[in-house]
Amino acid sequence: MKKPFNVIAIIGKPRDQQAIQTHRDLYHWLSSLGYQVFIDDRLSAILNDVPEEHFSGLVELGEKADLAIVVGGDGNMLGAARILSRFNTRVIGVNRGNLGFLTDLNPEDFQHSLKAVLDGAYIEEERFLLEAEIHRHGQVKSHNAALNEAVLHPGQVAHMIEFEVYIDESFAFSLRADGLIVSTPTGSTAYSLSGGGPILSPSLNAISLVPMFPHTLSSRPLVVDGNRRIKLLVSPDNRGTQEVSCDGQVSLPVSPGDEIHIYQSPNRLRLIHPKDYSYYHVLRNKLGWSSKLF
């Protein structure tokens, strides 16, 4: 019987000793099962019991592997997702972080659940990403992708920003606020949630726009079709510099008068879960929702 996966990548960053031990345990366990295993080269100086030829950079791991196991919290998953979404690589997470909305496996007993996944017992879903582009004088000055959200916000000094929002070139509204969160369904349980945005089911083809501390009593979050293109026109009268943050990890400088174009990326994150995965169980567990009464 053909195995669903043959080449497996282990991805993560050097953190505490427990997380490093999880990387080591995964490598030796998967190798003992006969898989070809490669590890994120950011761990090469620490995992000195792993042969040098088994380390690769993230792009090379995406090219080689048909399964990537991300060890850490959602932050590690976000960083890996922006790269792995370019490739035909399925991704699963071992939670060594805090909430872990995207990382399902328990690091203390991952073997049982992961073995079932390796045998083909898993749920697969595609999560879309956003592309964010900064346009200045008709040229794209910078761009990046975001799995959770792209956020327009002030630079180093906190102050209000004035901007206009267009959806498919149609004017929607203007705003004076601390910024705007443009979120995917995946990101709806992250920064967007903290800003009062709605929780969107991951399978929805939708994008939410969540104003940050708007200087008005009438502003509300807005959910639009996921195929819409969003343009933010930053007022030339703004003081100082602004930024667009992608997943809180990559910053794109914005100047007064710039245009910010945000749209759905053609790339997809192929996220997989154990067979018993339930999104609503995750919400109850992570957000402390009440259990069933009867």
Curated annotation (Swiss-Prot):
Pfam families: NAD_kinase, NAD_kinase_C. NAD(+) binds at residues 74-75, 148-149, 159, 176, 178, 189-194, 249. One of its GO terms (molecular function) is ATP binding. Keywords: ATP-binding, Cytoplasm, Kinase, NAD, NADP, Nucleotide-binding, Transferase. It catalyses: NAD(+) + ATP = ADP + NADP(+) + H(+). Its cofactor is a divalent metal cation. Involved in the regulation of the intracellular balance of NAD and NADP, and is a key enzyme in the biosynthesis of NADP. Catalyzes specifically the phosphorylation on 2'-hydroxyl of the adenosine moiety of NAD to yield NADP. This is NAD kinase. The gene is nadK.
